[in-house]
């Protein structure tokens, strides 16, 4: 194994899974992360997941979890965001939803039933950006262009590109904004009112950290230190399908569904397998969140104490 990707002995990565139940009612159990579980782990990488048949495999460590039902509309997830209150928001094919990561309960946010492509925002804020297509109740032009919300997704306003651009990937740190519509990158320094051409690169996911703009490309992870105008390949990174980060570090999920974490993008630690998740985001405290159509995973990285 490439030593730059090998899990280091001083790091523990744990996951709590909140998975969909059978939808028939019944008792609901709240997922609780127990510190003793982490202490008991003899391996350096632990995955806290569910013991039911839908659980991810435990090749990288020990697994336990709790399963609770999720609402059906959370299929076709296009993005996740942690708002100012710490609530996890999910952009879907049929609107914006909140997810209670302790119980798995979801609720619609606002009145829109639009297709929320590229949902994102500066982590820990109520300032969101999105693109996509109008829903059944909307008469907005298709595609929606760049939209923004200042109230956590309750209401939305059009910023630019209405009727012309569908951003499938968006990333912002609150100052810079980078977007991809499948025809190269576009960059903005005024919240998406005006745009400038960026690198001519195909990306599947974008995130912005203090170290630069990170992108998942067909050739692997790459980083830009000039606001998205050019990118440099990061050979130490695993073959990621999703990436997200803040000043507290980076999270990634590879094509096989394994989770990776990195403090700086130079060295990566491999965690357990969460499977075919559709979206990934990072909270302001460094916690990661990944979601599939029927489960949400809370990802934590902590220093081992013994």
What is the meaning of each model-derived region?
Residues 69-73, 109-112, 160-163, 196-201, ...:
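Surface loop/turn motifs at the tips and blade-to-blade linkers of beta-strand repeat domains
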Residues 95-109, 143-159, 186-197, 222-233, ...:
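Asp-box/BNR beta-propeller loop motif
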Residues 69-97, 115-118:
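Beta-strand-rich domains and repeat architectures in extracellular enzymes and scaffolds
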Residues 51-53:
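Bacterial signal peptide processing site
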Residues 281-306:
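Blade-level signature of beta-propeller repeat domains, shared across WD40, Kelch, NHL, RCC1
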Residues 46-49:
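C-terminal motif of bacterial Sec signal peptides marking the signal peptidase cleavage site
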Residues 76-79, 114-122, 164-172, 201-210, ...:
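Repeated scaffold domains used in trafficking and secretory/extracellular systems
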Residues 137-143, 180, 216:
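Short, solvent-exposed loop/turn segments at conserved positions within beta-propeller repeat blades
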